[in-house]
Every structure is written in C-alpha cells, then in structure tokens.
Amino acid sequence: IEVVYLSRETPKTHLVSNMHIGSRLPAYASSIGRVIISELNETEVKNMFKNKELKGATDIAPKNIEEILSQRKIDSERGYVWSFGMIEENIGSCAATIFNYDGIPVGGLNVSGPKDVFVNETSKEAIIVKEAVLEAARKASEAMGFRSR
C-alpha cells in the first residue's frame, strides 16, 4: 500500500529530500499515508495490510501490523501526523488529511524540513508549521466540498 506524490513545492533553501512528483512511499511510513490510515478503523487497517510485507525505509518505520495500529491510534487522537526521519533519516514532516465531500480521506499534505525543526512538537516553529498544515488541509478539503464535522 503506497502513497504517490502528485504535487511538490520546494523552497529556495537547500533541503536534501529525494521526494519528487511520482515518488511512491509505503503508506504506513510516510506522513501523508499515516494521516489517511489514521482516519480508517482498525479492521480496515488490518485488512489493508493483511499478508503484506512491511519494508521501512529506515529502522524506525513500523515492522508489523501491531506497530502500525499503535501508531494509527496516536495519529488519530492528534488529528495530524509528525514524522521524524521515518522515510529519510534527516528529514521531518507534519501532515494533515484532505477529505472529499463525503468526509472520506482522499489525500494529505505535508511540510517537510530538517528533522531538528520537527523533533520538538511544542517549539514555536513546530506549532507554526502544524497550524499552517492543518489550515491548508482544511481549505483543500472545503474546496472538495467537505464541511467540518
């Protein structure tokens, strides 16, 4: 189960990330995949990964369904995802879900940067990033006809 990058904006500053349009990442390890998984129920997640081999890009990626479900619970309670080097060791990200008009998760968006910026979720910078990501995802969802629950 993968996510596919459909769009990407890059800053003028240097950031070493290998993501580009068309990149495919394991949903359980990418921040965008994780926000979508966080909106599914446990049975849906179990069925999605039944008989699937989990190949994490880094050592901290989930290695089994129990780890995915544990991560899903935390992500679901938050309503957004922080990722600290799960795909690329020195890259962190914050992601939020995009919903369609029926409230079904159809995608996500994230902001990525140096892992150090994302490690402390309570830092001023991290809070600004989180709020911007949540607002952008809300606007994208509303553009698709979604109305907040």
Spell out what each predicted region is:
Residues 1-51:
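Amphipathic alpha-helical effector-binding/dimerization core
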Residues 8-10, 86, 110:
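Short clusters of small/polar residues that mark proteolytic maturation junctions
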Residues 23, 27, 63, 124-127:
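Residues at secondary-structure transition points
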Residues 89-90, 107-149:
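Juxtadomain coupling helices with adjacent low-complexity linkers
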Residues 98-101:
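Sensor-regulatory modules in signal-transduction proteins
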Residues 104:
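Helix-turn-helix DNA-binding module
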